[in-house]
Regions:
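Ser/Thr- and Asn-enriched, surface-exposed coil loops between beta-strands
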Residues: 12, 49-51, 107, 144-146, ...
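Extracellular interdomain linkers/hinges and stalk-like, low-complexity segments
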Residues: 1-28, 68-123, 167-200, 208-211, ...
């Protein structure tokens, strides 16, 4: 019995015909001999069907020699044994592949990314995130299992790129791959600027202002607030005529902008404007004699 070394990949199987290792001087039918497994090293699983030996490498077994399988063969004249050395080699399964994950997140808030949606995995076992770091932008990123958490820094807006590394079930450092999460970070708009008000008639004034930076989002509208009544007036334009104001007093106005990340701080108030009623037209004078 002359052992032939066995090479088996991580998470893979090989079958070995033990008759090919036997040399019988009596030239008997080697497939009729009694073959047995006496000892199996760690890191592999072994089964024997007649003279066919199946060796399975465990997925997470590091590459390298694991020891030897002790087998015996008996042609009827007495059993002999031999040790067959086994070496775990790199898995032949394809590497994990990744596609860019693209998400939107509000500044200061945390989003989770399930990487199983953006990776192909040759094994049924979940991938594991080894590490994650922010390469572009400001914020933090961390992995837990196959889930990535991303938190843009409060006050930051724009593009943020997170780079992560994942490992498959083999735990083989040669099979580590890298992926990306591209984050569009939205923040609250800046406060509107240069708010002005002009009286336009009884109980009304026209309020205009400069549109602020949207900070990665899209401004959906504005709220104009009257200093006298506290009444809000909503508009989608950077200016509107406000009506229903109290006459005979001065009004100033502040403006708040809105986008999908939230509300801006209130603007600085406009200069006060006096709103008053126009008196009714006087009746024509008459002369009494």
């Amino acid at each position: 019995l002359t052992p032939t070394p066995i090479l088996v990949g991580q998470g893979e199987n090989v079958t070995v015909d033990l008759t090919q290792m036997v040399d019988d001087p009596d030239d008997q039918a080697k497939n009729s001999f009694d073959y047995r497994v006496a000892k199996v090293p760690g890191g592999i699983d072994v089964s024997l069907d007649g003279y066919t030996l199946t060796v399975s490498g465990k997925k997470d077994q590091p590459k390298g020699p694991v020891g030897a399988i002790t087998v015996s063969v008996d042609d009827g004249s007495g059993a002999i044994t031999a040790d067959i050395p086994v070496t775990i080699v790199k898995s032949s399964k394809p590497l994990v592949t990744t596609t860019d994950a693209r998400i939107k997140v509000n500044a200061g808030q945390t989003a989770t990314v399930n990487l199983s949606e953006y990776t192909t995995n040759p094994f049924p076992d979940p991938l594991v995130v080894l590490d994650a770091s922010v390469h572009v932008g400001q914020g933090t990123a961390a992995g837990d299992g196959n889930v990535l958490t991303v938190t843009p820094k409060a006050g930051f807006h724009g593009d943020m790129i997170v780079v992560y590394r994942v490992m498959d079930a083999t735990n083989d450092p040669d099979r580590v791959v890298q992926g990306r999460v591209i984050v569009k970070v939205l923040d609250r708009p800046d406060a509107p600027q240069n708010v002005t008000a002009t009286a336009t008639g009884p109980g009304s004034a026209f309020v205009s202002f400069q549109e602020p930076a949207a900070n990665g989002g899209t401004i959906s509208g504005y709220t104009i607030i009257d200093s006298v009544s506290g009444e809000p007036y909503n508009t989608i334009n950077p200016g509107m005529e406000v009506t229903g104001l109290k006459n005979g007093v001065e009004h100033s106005f502040t403006v708040i902008a809105h986008n999908e990340a939230g509300d801006s701080d209130p603007s600085a108030p406009s200069a006060p404007v006096h709103v008053d009623a126009v008196p009714d037209q006087m009746a024509a004078p008459t002369v009494q004699g």
